[in-house]
């Protein structure tokens, strides 16, 4: 489905690519940001190293599971609602992680983060496919992929700060 870019996005093309890249990098960024804080979180919650590892496993399980469905949901309900619901759910889950009083709560909220963050990756690629012709889509995907690769490099620095 090729839609006209001018009806979908009124700003410059690079701003759309930047927005889609940020949405796409949210998943890997949210993993690598909190890993440097493992020991501090474990100490604050009285958690064992195995329990802390479960927070990562729960996130990745939710992320992998919902990657199967975000595309179908975006096809059924539209790209924008799926991204917005994903961002709202991710924001609520992030607040829940920050306010967790024990490791069980943290695991639950990390699972919710994983369930929601895949929307950015899956739907951003669908948007590129929808509105750009194949030759332009390759360039936009290259820009998005650069950010996707930079996120794991920047995240530990920010998380350890």
Spans of model-derived segments:
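Cytosolic juxtamembrane N-terminal segment immediately preceding the first transmembrane helix
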Residues: 1-27
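Residue-level signature of the transmembrane alpha-helical cores
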Residues: 23, 85-89, 93, 109, ...
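Residue-level signature of mid-helix packing/kink "hotspots" within the transmembrane helices
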Residues: 32, 60-68, 152-153
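Extracellular/periplasmic helix-loop-helix junction of adjacent transmembrane segments
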Residues: 37-64
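Helix-breaking motifs and short loop linkers at transmembrane-helix boundaries and internal kinks
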Residues: 46, 78, 99-105, 116, ...
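Cytoplasmic helix-loop-helix junction between adjacent transmembrane helices
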Residues: 111-148
